[in-house]
Regions:
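Outer-membrane beta-barrel proteins and related beta-barrel translocases across Gram-negative bacteria
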Residues: 100, 106-116, 123-153, 157-167, ...
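Bacterial Sec-dependent signal peptides at the C-terminal "C-region" and cleavage site
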Residues: 17-29
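Bacterial N-terminal signal peptides that target proteins for export
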Residues: 1-9
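Bacterial N-terminal signal peptides
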Residues: 8-19
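Charged (often Lys/Glu-rich) extended helix/loop segments that serve as interaction or gating elements
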Residues: 26-153
Length: 737
């Protein structure tokens, strides 16, 4: 409930309504206008307006209306003493500021000290949807408030499903940070008291607030009940931290620390550390389980660090460090992993830690980096190649002495290191010259030629002796020609979709392309292999394809709006004039697979991406990858992901959310490994969404691993949320899609 004390200050927005300056008054048709110094005129209208010069008192009776700017006050009666600056209004008092509303029977306020009271008050704050009542609300000092017999809810119903009540609450020193003291707070659910405290105290601040986080409760059939709690500590304006104390049943206690900082706008980062002494491991080290060649010990941990920083002269530094004590940690505690790290661990089967920095100019770029890889498929990384370091320099395409010729440059120095196996230093220099032109103002033509020089100095393990520098030179040349056809359609041609996305015109473009690429055969068998740079294949091939685009022009163009690409389809193929290609089945073919990419971006209702490679000899796909998200106006969602690489990967994943009867959602996820013929994980649940609260439950079923080293595990947890107040538990990510 951080910052909820701010609602009390809204009781006193009326203090901004007036100041001790002359008024504009209207009695019938008569009016007098006098301008205030700061906020414009105060306008008073009433059936009867009286001014007593002796007491310097204005009295207004009957349909009183007082207004200044977007603030307005209505009442049956009002009185302002211009000497004491006391304002009193009574009888059906209604105060508005924008969409915020205060109703009360009586208000008393000193417009100079801005201290006062309101009685029998009802308050509505639009932004937070707060409905507040109080028998008496009082501002008794600077940043000092008191509310008696009050209630709070975010429900719009006259009989709210839930509410908080309090006998008295007092808040002090809001601006500097202080304490709120509540007497007799009670939480009601459908008029039934379910939680009572005789007394409570809470810190109040205008900025971030330290305190305990609401705990999360769950259950695992393998390890028993789970209770996850934490403490948030905002110890500086530019730094904060969260401490986690989780009880994971038979596993025992798991601790965590997350530290966040933002020293400047361009220097910020986050560090996370987690530790558990896993009690499920046997007491005897000789009996520790071995999974995929790794021994799982008692003490298990992980840390993840992200950092970015800018230096003078536009130099920058970024880092992303990921480390786990054992690879099984990625499965047992995957909720600890940052989202990008989780994707790498599942798809690329590796954890990557990288630190890089450099500088970008208009026409050049300099990048230096170190990269360390943790291969999660291997028990040891002794033979895994690490880049320590790699320095790259790029010259972007630019004219040569303002001629039609352009040049660009790709260059790098890399040092490859590992505990076991060949190490090497490599220098790579690749300058290129290109000549772009237009033929008959219809065809786009570009030819290019480049010379690539690569130097190696290898070190043999274990003696670390060098075989001296070795070199490889090769030529890369090519040409490409393309054109573009297009047709423009009026938005009324596709009326429904044009109105839905507010598009005035559509443009369909077709871009056929043909190109040629040549690189001679070079002797490189004796050179080490670390990445794609180390093996440049003999190339003598023609490439042809076609690209289609669907572009929409918005009805109203603003500063940031413009033509938007809603869809794109690319189809391409290579034909070898030299060595044949080798397909997934190991056969030699002169025609490559037909590659294709398709994506649609009709968000929020439909977004899809598809890519694949079709073998033209078997007329079957060697690879297919599909990702689609569909949503309707009822907020139903379907997410489908399918991956198929012949002989290596075959999986399908579903995430869905369906609205049944009005407030009830059903949701689920299902991940299936088609290659192994077994399901991987299933998540099912339901959520009830009322206007001001929601509640749900989640059942998670994790299947055993294909090698049977991990047994099946089932988890269950519930969550509950009060609108704009807080939540207990954690809802699945796809409920927020």
């Amino acid at each position: 409930m951080r910052n909820r004390w701010l609602i009390l200050s809204a009781f006193f927005v009326l203090l901004l309504l007036t100041d001790p300056s002359p008024l504009q008054a209207k009695v019938g048709e008569a009016s007098v206008t006098k301008q205030t110094k700061m906020e414009g005129p105060v306008d008073i209208e009433a059936d009867e307006l009286i001014y007593d010069r002796d007491t310097q008192t204005y009295q207004a009776h009957g349909q009183v209306e007082v207004s200044r700017g977007d603030l307005s006050l209505k009442a049956d009666h009002a009185q302002l003493n211009n000497g004491t600056k006391e304002l009193v209004a009574w009888g059906n008092v209604l105060l508005r500021e924008g969409e915020d509303v205060i109703e009360c029977q009586r208000l008393e306020v000193n417009v100079e000290t801005r201290l006062g009271k309101i009685y029998q008050a009802r308050l509505y704050l639009k932004d937070q949807n707060f409905h507040i009542t109080g028998r008496e609300a009082e501002k008794i000092g600077e940043n000092h408030y008191r509310l008696r017999d009050g209630s709070l809810t975010t429900c719009d119903a006259k009989r709210p499903p839930w509410k908080f009540t309090v006998k008295e609450i007092e808040v002090k020193e809001m601006a500097l940070g202080g304490w709120g003291i509540a007497k007799g707070p009670i939480f009601y659910f459908e008029d039934i008291p379910v939680l009572y405290l005789p007394w409570g105290a809470f810190p109040v601040r205008r900025d971030r607030q330290s305190g305990f986080l609401i705990p999360r409760v769950g259950y695992s059939n393998k390890y028993g009940p789970e209770l996850k709690s934490g403490f948030y500590w905002a110890f500086a304006k530019n730094m904060d931290a969260t401490f986690y104390f989780d009880w994971l049943g038979d596993r025992g206690f798991k601790e965590g620390l997350e530290y966040r900082y933002a020293f400047t706008r361009d220097t910020k980062g986050e560090a996370k550390f987690y530790f558990i002494r896993d009690r499920t491991a046997p007491d005897d080290p000789a009996d520790f389980p071995v999974i995929n060649g790794q021994t799982i010990h008692h003490n298990r941990y992980a840390f993840f660090v992200e950092h970015e920083q800018k230096f003078p002269y536009d130099f920058y530094l970024k880092g992303d460090i990921n480390h786990v004590s054992d690879h099984q940690y990625l499965r047992d505690f995957d909720e600890d992993l940052p989202s990008g790290t989780k994707i790498d661990s599942r798809s690329a089967r590796q954890l990557r830690s990288v630190l890089f920095g450099g500088k970008n100019w208009d026409q050049f770029s300099l990048i230096a980096q170190t990269a360390v890889y943790d291969d999660v498929t291997q028990p040891s990384n002794d033979a895994t190649v690490q880049k320590l370091p790699q320095i790259s320099f790029y010259a972007h395409p630019q004219s040569i002495f303002r001629t039609p010729l352009f040049y660009d440059l790709t260059s790098s120095y890399s040092h490859f290191w590992r505990e076991e196996g060949v190490e090497a230093s490599r220098g790579d220099l690749f300058p290129r010259i290109s000549f772009p032109m237009r033929l008959l103002n219809v065809l786009k033509f570009e030819s290019d030629v480049g010379l690539r020089e690569t130097l190696y100095k290898s070190y043999e393990d274990p003696t670390r002796t060098s075989s001296g520098w070795e070199a490889r030179e090769t030529l890369v040349a090519g040409a490409q020609m393309s054109t573009e056809f297009y047709r423009v359609y009026d938005g009324e041609t596709f009326r429904k979709i044009s109105h839905l996305y507010k598009v005035a015109k559509w443009m369909h473009t077709v871009e056929p392309t043909i190109g040629y690429r040549y690189s001679p055969r070079v002797n490189q068998d004796a050179l080490p292999v670390f990445d794609e740079v180390d093996r440049i294949p003999y190339t003598n091939q023609i490439t042809y394809g076609i690209t289609q685009r669907l572009v929409g022009k918005p009805e109203k163009e603003g500063v940031s709006s413009g033509p938007f690409e809603y869809g794109k389809l690319m189809i391409f193929q290579n034909y070898s004039l030299g060595d044949p290609f080798t397909d997934a089945g190991g056969k030699k073919r002169f025609l490559s697979n037909i590659g294709a990419e398709l994506w649609w971006n009709f968000g929020p209702y439909l977004s899809a991406r598809w890519d694949g490679e079709l073998n033209p000899y078997r007329w079957s796909f060697d690879t297919i990858n599909v990702a689609m998200t569909a949503k309707d106006r009822r907020n139903d969602v379907l997410v489908v992901q399918y991956r198929n690489t012949r002989g290596a990967i075959q999986e399908i994943n579903f995430d869905t959310r369906v609205k049944t009867i009005s407030p009830l959602y059903l949701f689920g996820s299902f991940y299936y490994n088609l290659l192994e013929g077994m399901w991987v994980q299933g998540i099912f649940g339901a959520e009830y969404q009322a206007q001001c609260w929601s509640a749900g439950f989640v059942f998670e079923d994790i299947n055993r691993s294909p090698d049977r080293t991990q047994k099946r595990e089932m988890k269950f947890h519930v969550y509950f949320n009060l609108l704009n107040i807080g939540s207990v538990g954690h809802k699945p990510y796809f409920m927020a899609l």
